[in-house]
Regions:
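Conserved SAM/SAH-binding beta-strand->alpha-helix loop
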Residues: 87
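S-adenosyl-L-methionine
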Residues: 96-138
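A short SAM/SAH-binding and catalytic strip from SAM-dependent methyltransferases
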Residues: 149-161
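A short glycine-rich, Lys/Arg-flanked "PGG" loop and its adjoining helix->strand segment in the class I
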Residues: 163-175
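Conserved alpha-helix/loop element of class I SAM-dependent methyltransferases that forms part
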Residues: 34-57
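A short acidic, Gly/Pro-enriched loop at the edge of an enzyme's catalytic core
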Residues: 135-150
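Conserved class I S-adenosyl-L-methionine
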Residues: 57-66, 82, 180-201
Length: 201
Protein backbone atom coordinates (compact mmCIF):
# COMPACT_ATOMS: atom_id res chain seq x y z
CA UNK A 1 0.00 0.00 0.00
CA UNK A 2 1.04 3.62 -0.39
CA UNK A 3 1.24 3.94 3.40
CA UNK A 4 3.86 1.19 3.67
CA UNK A 5 7.17 2.53 5.01
CA UNK A 6 9.83 2.62 2.27
CA UNK A 7 12.29 0.44 4.17
CA UNK A 8 9.68 -2.35 4.41
CA UNK A 9 8.85 -2.27 0.69
CA UNK A 10 9.83 -4.88 -1.88
CA UNK A 11 11.50 -2.07 -3.84
CA UNK A 12 13.77 -1.17 -0.91
CA UNK A 13 14.61 -4.80 -0.16
CA UNK A 14 15.53 -5.44 -3.80
CA UNK A 15 17.62 -2.26 -4.03
CA UNK A 16 19.47 -3.02 -0.82
CA UNK A 17 20.18 -6.63 -1.78
CA UNK A 18 21.74 -5.26 -4.98
CA UNK A 19 23.62 -2.56 -3.05
CA UNK A 20 24.98 -5.08 -0.54
CA UNK A 21 25.53 -8.21 -2.62
CA UNK A 22 25.43 -7.25 -6.30
CA UNK A 23 28.46 -7.84 -8.49
CA UNK A 24 30.25 -4.85 -10.01
CA UNK A 25 28.59 -5.67 -13.34
CA UNK A 26 25.13 -5.86 -11.76
CA UNK A 27 25.57 -2.63 -9.81
CA UNK A 28 27.19 -0.62 -12.58
CA UNK A 29 27.06 -2.23 -16.04
CA UNK A 30 28.70 0.78 -17.69
CA UNK A 31 32.52 0.56 -17.90
CA UNK A 32 32.85 4.33 -17.57
CA UNK A 33 30.89 4.27 -14.30
CA UNK A 34 32.39 5.09 -10.89
CA UNK A 35 33.74 1.65 -10.02
CA UNK A 36 35.51 3.02 -6.93
CA UNK A 37 32.08 3.80 -5.44
CA UNK A 38 30.90 0.18 -5.55
CA UNK A 39 30.79 -2.36 -2.71
CA UNK A 40 30.22 0.29 -0.07
CA UNK A 41 29.10 -2.10 2.73
CA UNK A 42 32.32 -4.09 2.31
CA UNK A 43 34.47 -0.95 2.21
CA UNK A 44 32.94 0.33 5.45
CA UNK A 45 34.71 -2.58 7.13
CA UNK A 46 37.79 -3.16 4.97
CA UNK A 47 38.76 0.54 4.87
CA UNK A 48 37.52 1.79 8.26
CA UNK A 49 38.06 -1.00 10.76
CA UNK A 50 41.44 -0.82 12.51
CA UNK A 51 41.99 -4.55 12.77
CA UNK A 52 45.30 -4.22 14.63
CA UNK A 53 43.45 -2.68 17.59
CA UNK A 54 41.14 -5.65 18.10
CA UNK A 55 41.77 -7.86 21.12
CA UNK A 56 40.85 -11.50 21.66
CA UNK A 57 37.33 -12.60 20.73
CA UNK A 58 36.13 -9.11 19.76
CA UNK A 59 32.42 -8.30 19.52
CA UNK A 60 30.90 -5.94 16.96
CA UNK A 61 27.55 -4.19 16.62
CA UNK A 62 26.25 -3.14 13.19
CA UNK A 63 23.53 -0.56 13.83
CA UNK A 64 21.25 -0.02 10.85
CA UNK A 65 22.58 -3.18 9.24
CA UNK A 66 19.92 -3.32 6.48
CA UNK A 67 20.30 -6.68 4.67
CA UNK A 68 23.53 -7.47 6.44
CA UNK A 69 26.60 -7.30 4.21
CA UNK A 70 28.69 -5.17 6.59
CA UNK A 71 27.61 -7.44 9.45
CA UNK A 72 29.00 -10.46 7.63
CA UNK A 73 32.17 -8.55 6.71
CA UNK A 74 32.72 -7.71 10.39
CA UNK A 75 32.59 -11.46 11.09
CA UNK A 76 35.87 -11.82 9.17
CA UNK A 77 37.55 -10.06 12.11
CA UNK A 78 35.18 -10.34 15.08
CA UNK A 79 34.17 -13.41 17.06
CA UNK A 80 30.57 -12.28 17.50
CA UNK A 81 28.62 -9.73 15.45
CA UNK A 82 25.12 -8.42 16.10
CA UNK A 83 23.26 -6.67 13.27
CA UNK A 84 20.24 -4.54 14.19
CA UNK A 85 17.80 -2.82 11.86
CA UNK A 86 14.39 -1.21 12.30
CA UNK A 87 13.06 -2.82 9.11
CA UNK A 88 11.44 -6.20 9.66
CA UNK A 89 11.86 -6.93 5.93
CA UNK A 90 15.59 -6.21 5.98
CA UNK A 91 16.13 -8.42 9.04
CA UNK A 92 14.03 -11.23 7.55
CA UNK A 93 16.21 -11.28 4.42
CA UNK A 94 19.44 -10.91 6.40
CA UNK A 95 18.44 -13.92 8.49
CA UNK A 96 17.68 -15.95 5.38
CA UNK A 97 21.20 -15.18 4.17
CA UNK A 98 22.64 -16.14 7.56
CA UNK A 99 20.86 -19.49 7.48
CA UNK A 100 21.06 -20.37 3.78
CA UNK A 101 24.15 -18.46 2.65
CA UNK A 102 22.44 -17.25 -0.53
CA UNK A 103 19.13 -15.78 -1.63
CA UNK A 104 17.63 -15.28 -5.11
CA UNK A 105 16.11 -11.87 -5.82
CA UNK A 106 15.15 -9.63 -8.73
CA UNK A 107 16.18 -6.02 -9.27
CA UNK A 108 14.97 -3.25 -11.56
CA UNK A 109 17.21 -2.43 -14.51
CA UNK A 110 15.20 0.26 -16.28
CA UNK A 111 11.49 1.02 -16.34
CA UNK A 112 9.69 -2.33 -16.13
CA UNK A 113 12.78 -4.35 -17.03
CA UNK A 114 14.14 -6.54 -14.25
CA UNK A 115 17.03 -8.95 -13.84
CA UNK A 116 17.35 -12.05 -11.69
CA UNK A 117 20.30 -12.26 -9.31
CA UNK A 118 21.52 -14.18 -6.28
CA UNK A 119 22.71 -12.51 -3.08
CA UNK A 120 25.50 -14.62 -1.62
CA UNK A 121 27.57 -14.42 1.54
CA UNK A 122 31.23 -15.16 0.72
CA UNK A 123 32.04 -18.79 1.54
CA UNK A 124 34.99 -17.94 3.77
CA UNK A 125 32.82 -15.96 6.22
CA UNK A 126 31.62 -17.89 9.28
CA UNK A 127 27.91 -17.06 9.32
CA UNK A 128 27.54 -18.66 12.76
CA UNK A 129 29.36 -15.66 14.23
CA UNK A 130 26.46 -13.41 13.17
CA UNK A 131 22.98 -12.81 14.53
CA UNK A 132 20.37 -10.34 13.35
CA UNK A 133 17.78 -8.57 15.50
CA UNK A 134 14.95 -6.24 14.60
CA UNK A 135 15.24 -3.19 16.80
CA UNK A 136 15.19 0.57 17.10
CA UNK A 137 18.57 2.32 17.15
CA UNK A 138 16.94 5.06 19.23
CA UNK A 139 15.84 2.59 21.92
CA UNK A 140 18.33 -0.26 22.06
CA UNK A 141 17.62 -3.28 24.24
CA UNK A 142 19.61 -3.40 27.45
CA UNK A 143 20.94 -6.97 27.18
CA UNK A 144 23.25 -6.42 24.20
CA UNK A 145 26.41 -6.26 26.30
CA UNK A 146 29.48 -4.25 25.34
CA UNK A 147 31.29 -4.17 22.02
CA UNK A 148 34.78 -3.58 20.67
CA UNK A 149 33.34 -2.12 17.46
CA UNK A 150 30.14 -0.24 16.65
CA UNK A 151 29.42 0.47 12.98
CA UNK A 152 26.76 2.98 11.93
CA UNK A 153 26.69 3.08 8.12
CA UNK A 154 24.09 5.23 6.35
CA UNK A 155 22.13 5.54 9.58
CA UNK A 156 22.80 8.76 11.42
CA UNK A 157 20.91 10.99 8.95
CA UNK A 158 17.83 8.74 9.18
CA UNK A 159 17.39 9.00 12.95
CA UNK A 160 14.88 11.16 14.77
CA UNK A 161 17.53 12.34 17.24
CA UNK A 162 21.13 11.45 16.28
CA UNK A 163 22.68 12.89 19.45
CA UNK A 164 20.36 10.83 21.65
CA UNK A 165 21.32 7.71 19.72
CA UNK A 166 25.03 8.45 20.03
CA UNK A 167 24.69 9.07 23.76
CA UNK A 168 23.56 5.45 24.24
CA UNK A 169 26.85 4.20 22.86
CA UNK A 170 28.86 5.12 25.94
CA UNK A 171 27.34 2.08 27.60
CA UNK A 172 27.77 -0.19 24.58
CA UNK A 173 31.29 0.59 23.41
CA UNK A 174 34.28 -0.67 25.37
CA UNK A 175 36.86 1.86 26.50
CA UNK A 176 39.24 2.20 23.57
CA UNK A 177 36.68 0.65 21.22
CA UNK A 178 36.04 1.76 17.66
CA UNK A 179 32.98 3.75 16.56
CA UNK A 180 32.72 3.84 12.77
CA UNK A 181 30.22 6.31 11.28
CA UNK A 182 29.82 6.61 7.51
CA UNK A 183 27.10 8.79 6.04
CA UNK A 184 26.23 11.04 3.09
CA UNK A 185 24.54 13.37 5.65
CA UNK A 186 21.48 13.81 3.45
CA UNK A 187 19.35 15.34 6.19
CA UNK A 188 15.60 15.19 5.54
CA UNK A 189 12.79 16.54 7.71
CA UNK A 190 10.86 13.34 6.94
CA UNK A 191 13.32 11.46 9.17
CA UNK A 192 15.05 14.04 11.36
CA UNK A 193 13.57 17.35 12.56
CA UNK A 194 15.92 20.13 11.47
CA UNK A 195 16.43 21.04 15.13
CA UNK A 196 18.23 17.68 15.48
CA UNK A 197 20.38 17.87 12.35
CA UNK A 198 24.12 17.71 13.04
CA UNK A 199 24.87 20.06 10.15
CA UNK A 200 23.50 21.42 6.91
CA UNK A 201 21.87 24.50 8.42
Amino acid sequence: SSSQPFYESEKAISEYLLFHYGSSQEQCPHPEGPSEALHYPERCVSQCLQKELLGDHPRALDLGCAVGRSTFELARHCHEVVGIDYSHGFIEHANKLRIEGSLPYRFAVEGNLTQDAVAKVPDEIDRDRVRFLQGDAMHLREDLGVFDVVLMANLIDRLDDPVACLSQLSGLLKSGGQLIITSPYTWLEAYTPSTHWLGGL
